[in-house]
A protein has these predicted regions:
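PLP-dependent amino-acid enzyme catalytic core
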Residues: 1-228
Length: 228
């Protein structure tokens, strides 16, 4: 998925394929989303907006840096408007920004954090079946899948796709910012909602969501001794 071609690729493209279809079907002209200053999700959302002729507003945590580089620079080059949350709650500011866009005559559509809604997660339910089909065609035996996991859409989507395909193996989520006992209920709920959206109702239980939280370290994006 790093070769998808949307502003250097990344896993969010599969989610955005469905999220953008939803936004366009609703007649939106402006996308808004939220993330960290160097968010890959925000960079890909800005690229998807530019590709489809939509405006883009990004709500980023913290304060503007003295110099902009990396994904933040790409966000600017892709035409995104950037709002810095500072000490404010990012999600509250996101809602306020959407209201301001509507008041200005635009038709805003909020893309959730990480693209992780049932619509976004559907992209990875499909991806799981694609992966399993490719593995079977290549003669590979797959009984474990491991992914980085944060907002939950990738892992929840894979869980739905695996269940629908009758995959007997396990989906492992390596948490980047949440303890397992706090995260598993949210994952199970998202997977359950995604299965319902896809017309294959199934209730996922928190204990079915395998989350490894031993690698959290000092937090998201914090380089510690273990990483050195």
């Amino acid at each position: 998925d790093d070769q998808t071609g949307l502003a250097s690729g990344g896993n969010k493209t599969r989610k955005l394929e469905y999220l953008l279809a939803q936004a366009l079907a609703e007649g939106a002209d402006t996308l808004l989303t939220v993330g960290a200053p160097q968010s890959n999700h925000c960079r890909q959302t800005a690229a998807a907006a530019a590709k489809t002729g939509l405006r883009c507003v990004l709500v980023l945590g913290g304060n503007a840096p003295r110099l902009e580089g990396g994904n933040l620079l790409l966000d600017r080059l892709l035409g995104a408007e950037i709002l810095w949350a500072g000490e404010q709650d990012r999600l509250a500011l996101l809602a306020e920004a959407a209201q301001a866009q509507a008041a200005a005559g635009h038709r805003p559509h909020i893309i959730p954090y990480g693209g992780s809604s049932p619509v976004g997660a559907a992209g990875y339910a499909v991806a799981c079946q694609e992966l399993l089909a490719q593995a079977a065609a290549a003669g590979w035996r797959v009984d474990h899948m491991a992914v980085a996991s944060s907002s939950g859409g990738t892992q929840a989507g894979l869980a739905v796709g695996a269940w629908a395909a009758g995959f007997a193996g396990q989906i492992h989520g390596i948490s980047i910012d949440r303890r397992a006992d706090d995260y598993q209920p949210a994952l199970a709920e998202l997977a359950t909602q995604t299965a319902g959206l896809l017309g294959a109702p199934h209730t996922f239980r928190p204990e079915e969501m395998i989350v490894h939280d031993a690698y959290l370290g000092g937090g998201y994006g914090v380089l510690g001794e273990a990483e050195r």
